[in-house]
Amino acid sequence: MTDMRALGYLIHLGSNMWRDTPLAGAAPDATDHVLMRCCADYNRCDDAVWRRLTDHAAARGFNMLVIDLGEGVQYPSRPELAVKGSWTPDKLRKELARLRSIGLEPIPKLNFSATHDTWLGEYHRMVSTPEYYRVCEDVLRDAYELFDHPRLFHIGYDEETAWHQQWHRYSVVRSGELWWHDFLKIESFVEKLGTRPWIWSDKIWHHEAEFLKRMPKTVLQSNWYYDAEFTEEELEKAKASEDRKAYVKAYRTLEKAGYDQLPAASNWGCDINFEKTVRYCRKWIAPERLKGFMTAPWWLTEKKKEAKCLAAIDLAAAAMEKERLGLL
């Protein structure tokens, strides 16, 4: 798929991407939300649920699957990152072939935000060191080869703030020149591999001038916003914070600056978000820079949240059908 606009689904193969608190040590009354964010020493991806979700996405007209890899795969150059049940390279390759056969373009995702890198194991505590840079390049190269040279590679880089790490046992937040040094180092390496870097765009929310000055236009942008209010009137009526207004504004700012975008929506906060994201972004983003849409339900590939993930697929498919019929 090259020219066709993407309709993507974000699916989790790995899960150790939030808190560094071990799952085994979680409080007895911990909610599903907390448990999902703890790190586990085994792969929590349910193969049967994975199959049903991917088949359903293909049946509903999706053409892209963004795979959050994390610790979910055994990296040939870094076997120490695997956990019990991590997919072998052979298993992953066979599944990627199946996905392509049903019309889903598989795209690798590895998140290098210091808030979301628990999957890096001991290297999670070595951020910005020579060994950290080596392991990042090793897993990027491995994933690039395992995916047979994909045209896009999502490298994350969202939510690297102290607030987002308040529940971590070990916290590290890069800022200023160090954040840009590390980001541009990874971004450049991905481009040298022969693929296009893709990131979450929330860095722009509170560092707009710096972002517009330093973010390469070659990087595909996924701004994300999961609430129901988009217009100025809706935001004012909801008494939205200045932060929330900035989240929505970012779509327009990125467009004005000439960045390619693939907006991310979700049923995490409400069921109407995907439809309203499509409506808003079609209005404000030029067709040649609007590369598609992605839904990200943010639940793991487990039976207990399968219905929520299926609903995310259905809501996105319904919104795209409305768009096709001119009802948005």
Residue positions per predicted region:
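Hydrophobic alpha-helix position signal
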Residues: A57, L99, V190, L254, ...
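Aromatic-lined carbohydrate-binding surfaces of glycoside hydrolases
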Residues: L7-L220, Y225
